[in-house]
């Protein structure tokens, strides 16, 4: 009766949760069921610690135990199906707000996501399952219940409870995991986006600094070119200054030479003018003496004397007449016309020579006239 009661209590304690209506029914994963059975199975220590079965156990009890284990397996399969459906809902129904999901997702990508979720569920089961803790609990229960009859149903009950709690924990984890994963991914995506924004800001800042540096380099090059041009101009000016000084000195020397030449010419002209003045004064004096002499003496005697002398020396007479004629004409020209100023020194010298010759002739004539007067008085 106890076995039947236990068999009646087992399905009541292990109700399988109803699957979601929109969940996609998939064949159970054999790897997951085997792993669960291996986890839920008793360790070798427990089997060795069991007392040997008695012959008094009926085959009815064996059948009941087989049915219990089959029921447990069915419940585990249903739990796994429900967990897979919940995971699919969580992955498909909760899209990321910040992430961009393209519309043309293929079925291969969906299947890959489902496989990843199943692998994640396996990992969660293996990670969160603590075999040492369960072994300790089982050992304590085995020590408390030493009877072989009550050990199997109690172990079945504990196993059922453990499977139920494990299934519900797995469901909660599978429900919470995508949410936590989505939050984690959102946080990482936000961090990446913030990092990208910071990098873009830094790139803008660096580009601005690069532009400023390029402008500074251009201004610096322009300043260098200007300073180089000014230095070249200064050097050219310094090199040209001695040449300019020499050219100015040469110009001044040439001007001094011209001035000295002009002063020398002026001095010559002044000397010639003074000489001409003296000559003119002499001429004036001679003419006065000649007029006085002509007025005081008769015309006949001097003419006779002159005729005799002319006969004696006809050549001298003709020369004297020509000289007298020239003297009279020049005297009249000197009184009427102004004396010409000769610019060239050669002309001045020739004129001076002519004047000297004229003066010599006038002096000779004056001497000849005096001699004639003396001879006539005798």
From Swiss-Prot:
GO terms for biological process: positive regulation of transcription by RNA polymerase II. It comes from the Eukaryota. It is found in: Cytoplasm; Nucleus. The keyword Metal-binding does not apply. Residues 182-233 form a coiled coil. Keywords: Coiled coil, Cytoplasm, DNA-binding, Nucleus, Phosphoprotein, Proto-oncogene, Transcription, Transcription regulation. Induction: Down-regulated by testosterone and retinoic acid. GO terms for molecular function: DNA-binding transcription factor activity; DNA-binding transcription factor activity, RNA polymerase II-specific; E-box binding. Transcription factor that binds to the DNA sequence 5'-CANNTG-3'(E box) and the G-box motif. Directly binds to a guanine-rich region of the PCNA promoter and up-regulates its expression which in turn induces cell transformation and tumor formation. May play an important role in the regulation of cell proliferation and differentiation during spermatogenesis. PANTHER family: SPERMATOGENIC LEUCINE ZIPPER PROTEIN 1. Interacts with PPP1CC isoform gamma-2. This interaction can prevent SPZ1 binding to the E-box and inhibits PPP1CC activity. The helix-loop-helix and basic motifs form a Spz1 specific bHLH different from the classical one. This is Spermatogenic leucine zipper protein 1. It comes from Mus musculus. The gene is Spz1.
């Amino acid at each position: 009766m106890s076995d039947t009661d236990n068999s009646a209590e087992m399905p009541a304690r292990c109700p399988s949760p109803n699957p979601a209506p929109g969940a996609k029914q998939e064949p159970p994963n054999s790897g997951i069921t085997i792993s669960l059975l291996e986890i839920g199975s008793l360790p070798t220590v427990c089997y060795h610690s069991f007392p040997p079965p008695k012959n008094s156990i009926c085959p009815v009890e064996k059948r009941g135990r087989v049915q219990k284990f089959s029921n447990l397996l069915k419940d585990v399969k249903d739990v796994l199906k429900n967990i897979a459906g919940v995971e699919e809902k969580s992955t498909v129904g909760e899209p990321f707000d910040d992430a961009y999901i393209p519309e043309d997702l293929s079925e291969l990508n969906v299947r890959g996501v489902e496989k990843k979720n199943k692998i994640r569920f396996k990992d969660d089961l293996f990670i969160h399952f603590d075999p040492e803790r369960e072994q300790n609990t089982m050992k304590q229960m085995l020590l408390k219940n030493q009877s072989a009859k009550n050990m199997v149903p109690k172990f079945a009950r504990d196993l059922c409870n453990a499977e139920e709690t494990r299934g519900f924990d797995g469901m909660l984890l599978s429900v919470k995991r995508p949410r936590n994963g989505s939050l984690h991914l959102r946080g990482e995506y936000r961090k990446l986006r913030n990092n990208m924004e910071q990098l873009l800001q830094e790139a803008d800042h660096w580009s601005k600094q690069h532009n400023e540096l390029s402008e500074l380099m251009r201004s610096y090059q322009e300043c260098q070119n200007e300073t180089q041009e000014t230095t070249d101009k200064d050097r050219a000016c310094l090199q040209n200054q001695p040449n300019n000084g020499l050219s100015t000195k040469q110009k001044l020397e040439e001007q001094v030479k011209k001035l000295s030449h002009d002063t020398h010419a002026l001095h010559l002209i002044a000397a010639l003018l003074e000489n001409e003045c003296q000559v003119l004064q002499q001429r004036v004096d001679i003419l006065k003496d000649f007029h006085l002499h002509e007025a005081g003496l008769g015309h006949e005697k001097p003419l006779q004397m002159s005729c005799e002398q002319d006969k004696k020396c006809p050549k001298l007479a003709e020369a004297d007449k020509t000289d007298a004629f020239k003297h009279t004409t020049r005297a009249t020209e000197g009184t009427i016309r102004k004396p010409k100023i000769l610019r060239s020194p050669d002309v001045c010298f020739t004129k001076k020579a002519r004047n000297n010759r004229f003066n010599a002739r006038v002096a000779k004539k004056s001497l000849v006239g005096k001699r004639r007067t003396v001879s006539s008085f005798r």
